[in-house]
Amino acid sequence: MYKFFDDKGRIMVLRPDMTIPIARVVGTKFKDSNPPLRFRYTANVFRVNESLGGKKNEYTDCGVELIGLTDEESDLEILVTALDSLKVLKNNNFKFEIGNINFFNAAVSDLDLSEEEREKLAELIDTKSLKSLEDYLEELNVSEDYKAFFKKLPWLFGGEEVLAEGKKYAFNEELKKNIEYLESLANSLKELGYGDMLTFDLGMVPGLNYYTGIIFRGYFEGVGVTVLSGGRYDNLISQFGRDIPAVGFSIKLDSLLGVIEYDDTKKPSKYKIYYGKGYALEAIKKAKLLRDSGHVVELIPKEDTDGIESKEELK
């Protein structure tokens, strides 16, 4: 992060992402608002990258956050929104990876590792630095079984078959539970028509330490950086005064300039789709049809609704 001092000696930081600022806004300005809350934003963010490494230190982030829901349907909604955000660019040469941070967390929860050791281990697994990972595991006070597990993690990526393979290495119920959650999401996404766009990475352990559940990334062929990233962060907003779950993602707009083929001549209509318990998948299907036609859609769970109903907002 870029840090400096103001004229009173206080430490100032240029924002490295927009998730934390939005968490602060939800915990203060929207502390009495009823969930779910939905935010969208476009803003510049700043991160320190290695010189001559081919990465920018300032770029434009565009993203969405879904606040207040913690069920599988909300994860599914944000995944569909992320996938559609890439599809609308009219360029099918993209890769979409899904993981679960709790797969790594469930493995290290019983180990006597410091926070620094956990972060270093996560970084080596996430970047698939195989030799460095092997050397670092020899420095840690962990059993041979754990060493074998962590050495295998960077290799557990690919199609849906990776989830079945991951189950073979799941040595406790929590690990199995996290894979089964990904399997459930995968089945729903396949039913919605996204099956051939998905890959999975059980060794995805991003550096931002606020994630608590699903995590995902999007890539385009010919673009050397991640263009989309996101996940669930249920504990972050509580640091700003409101205990409420959240999930979201952001897109690096600068990295898309070479792959965008977008028709902005159409003026979209806006719809709200209300759905009752058990109708989330049907509601997402209806939203997908409308979004594929260029419309803006907001999904709203409503307990007193039997089935689904949609309303077009007046312009």
Tell me the role of every PLM-derived stretch.
Residues 1, 110-112, 214, 313-314:
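Short low-complexity, flexible loop/linker segments enriched in glycine and/or proline
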